[in-house]
């Protein structure tokens, strides 16, 4: 991708690092792999369209926070929510859609296994 030999790419990354915020390690995540890769792709390679698709039992609250006001990265998360009672708490509501220029670029698909 970075040397112009492919037009598109896809990576499956473990561990996700998605609880690590821009200024806070959390959920056993010390750095946010996807956010670092996205920023490097933008800065060093001029990538303009980046999608981070996070499918995990927990919301990627760190990744969401890092790109919350950013319209250059589309962040999509599918995660367990249980009405805000599942880790990491109320973060990851379908109402959290981004802010400013990033509004609409932060998409949350929470599901409830325990609706109470």
Range-by-range predicted roles:
Residues 1-5:
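Fold-level signal for large, globular catalytic cores of enzyme and receptor domains
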Residues 8-116:
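Conserved alpha-helical scaffold segments that buttress catalytic/binding sites
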């Amino acid at each position: 991708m970075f040397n112009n030999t492919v037009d598109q790419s896809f990576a499956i990354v473990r561990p996700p690092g998605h609880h690590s915020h821009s200024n806070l390690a959390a959920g056993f995540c010390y750095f946010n792999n996807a956010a670092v890769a996205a920023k490097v792709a933008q800065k060093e390679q001029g990538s303009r369209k980046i999608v981070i698709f996070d499918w995990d039992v927990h919301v990627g609250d760190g990744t969401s926070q890092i790109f919350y006001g950013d319209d250059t990265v589309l962040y999509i998360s599918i995660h367990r929510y249980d009405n805000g009672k599942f880790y990491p708490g109320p973060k990851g509501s379908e109402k959290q859609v981004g802010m400013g220029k990033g509004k609409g670029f932060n998409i949350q698909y929470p599901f409830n296994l325990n609706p109470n």
